[in-house]
Amino acid sequence: MTDTTISIRKAIDADLTAIVAMLADDALGSTREDNSSPLNQCYTDAFKAIDSDPNQLLTVVEHDGKVVGCLQLSFIPGLSRKGMWRGQIESVRITSDIRGGGIGRQMIEWAIAQCRERGCGLVQLTTDKSRADAMRFYKSLGFVDSHEGMKLSL
């Protein structure tokens, strides 16, 4: 891909099928997501909750009129660090046919700018330990692996 002109916008419900397809399009996502048609109601319910929360922003990335990426930003208030707000970047995906073309970098730089505009003092994200390429990518953008994350499935 030579032209990496993109537009980033707030996701709408019509984008859900494309978003879920991207979430399911890797080794980990294929085991966690339900990319069946019609779309599972759980995604519609989650979208409504995200869309109605002013501290959540689900976005899509368009290139040549097609949705090719997505990410979710959460703006998190906190008491530590003198009441500092944090930006949490999650669900970063790019369609497999255009990965490596610079769009991911543009997406993350845009997300960081959004966090700055909202007054966040830091931006954080997590990625699965098995995603070595993602780790290298985030480090190239200045992220450091300063903390050890833990999860408990419920």
What are these regions (language model features)?
Residues 24-46:
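Conserved GNAT-fold acetyl-CoA-binding loop/helix
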Residues 7-21:
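A short beta-loop-alpha structural element at the N-terminal edge
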Residues 60, 66-75, 93:
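Conserved beta-strand in the GNAT
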Residues 48-60, 88:
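A short helix-loop-beta-strand connector motif used in the catalytic cores of GNAT acetyltransferases and
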Residues 90-94, 100-113, 140:
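Conserved acetyl-CoA-binding loop-helix of GNAT-fold acetyltransferases
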Residues 108, 115-126:
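Conserved GNAT acetyl-CoA-binding A-motif
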Residues 78-89, 99, 145-146:
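A conserved beta-turn-beta hairpin within the catalytic core of GNAT-like acetyltransferases
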Residues 105, 117, 129-147:
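Conserved active-site alpha-helix within GNAT-family acetyltransferase domains
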